[in-house]
């Protein structure tokens, strides 16, 4: 185990920390969506930046050893999750219908990150209630953290992303119903492309676990949307005050 890489001087309250962890989930699913629809190259340096911050956090979120109650202990600054905050806010303002007419709902592309996020929140409970899957995640984290020294701490190295993707396949990828990611069919033939998508989903799974550790629940999220939106807006203001 390694210490969490960053420390922040200010403290957020319980609700704000929970909202920030949830925003991390939505950042992961937004990146999943962007990569699937337009390809890993088109998300640009900004998308890569947000992805790298999620990777760093996901490698330090432990199944049962997270003593910190501050989500920012796993990030450098609020700006690292700006994409997630924006995606989460949009999702709350445009709620996703939970009663699709078919098993594979034809959702507007803007709502796909929301559907992926809700699926990850459900998968997280199943993954972390299975000791075998928990062991896979811990082993994968240890392996990747050791590998980083060989790749000059390049979190975006193809081998690092491939191992994150494999961790997802070996855990959440074994549970039905699986997340069906919609995108460019031709791009899915490229293993680097699919690795990127699965690695993004793995980081979302980890942030979902942190959210759960901080007291997050699906019911609370559904019935406290107004409070959640207030917390997101407060975090957005704090982000600009801290720059």
Swiss-Prot record:
Bilayer topology: Peripheral membrane protein
Family: Belongs to the HflD family.
Keyword terms: Cell inner membrane, Cell membrane, Cytoplasm, Membrane
NCBIfam families xrefs: PRK00218.1-6
InterPro entries, per the entry: HflD (IPR007451), HflD-like_sf (IPR035932)
Domain of life of the source: Bacteria
Pfam families: DUF489 (PF04356)
Subcellular location, record wording: Cytoplasm; Cell inner membrane
UniProt-listed HAMAP family: HflD_protein
Cellular component GO terms, alphabetical: cytoplasm; plasma membrane
Identification of the protein by name: High frequency lysogenization protein HflD homolog
Species assigned in the record: Acinetobacter baylyi (strain ATCC 33305 / BD413 / ADP1)
């Amino acid at each position: 185990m390694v210490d969490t890489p960053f420390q922040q001087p200010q403290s957020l309250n319980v609700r704000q920390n929970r909202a920030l962890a949830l925003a991390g989930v939505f950042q992961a699913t937004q990146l999943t969506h962007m990569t699937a629809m337009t390809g890993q190259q088109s998300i640009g340096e900004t998308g890569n930046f947000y992805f790298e911050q999620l990777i760093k956090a996901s490698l330090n979120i432990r199944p049962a050893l997270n003593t910190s109650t501050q989500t920012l202990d796993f990030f450098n600054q609020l700006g690292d999750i700006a994409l997630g905050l924006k995606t989460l806010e949009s999702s709350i303002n445009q709620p996703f219908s939970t009663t699709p007419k078919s098993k594979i709902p034809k959702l507007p592309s803007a709502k796909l990150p929301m559907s992926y996020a809700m699926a990850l929140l459900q998968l997280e409970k199943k993954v972390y209630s299975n000791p075998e899957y928990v062991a896979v995640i811990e082993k994968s984290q240890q392996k990747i953290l050791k590998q980083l020294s060989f790749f000059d701490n390049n979190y975006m190295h193809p081998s690092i992303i491939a191992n994150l993707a494999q961790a997802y396949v070996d855990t959440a990828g074994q549970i039905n119903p699986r997340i069906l990611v919609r995108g460019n069919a031709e791009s899915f033939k490229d293993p680097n492309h699919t690795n990127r998508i699965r690695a993004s989903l793995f980081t979302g799974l980890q942030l979902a676990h942190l959210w759960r550790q901080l007291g997050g629940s699906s019911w609370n999220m559904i019935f406290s949307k107004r409070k959640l939106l207030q917390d997101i807006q407060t975090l957005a203001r704090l982000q600009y005050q801290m720059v």
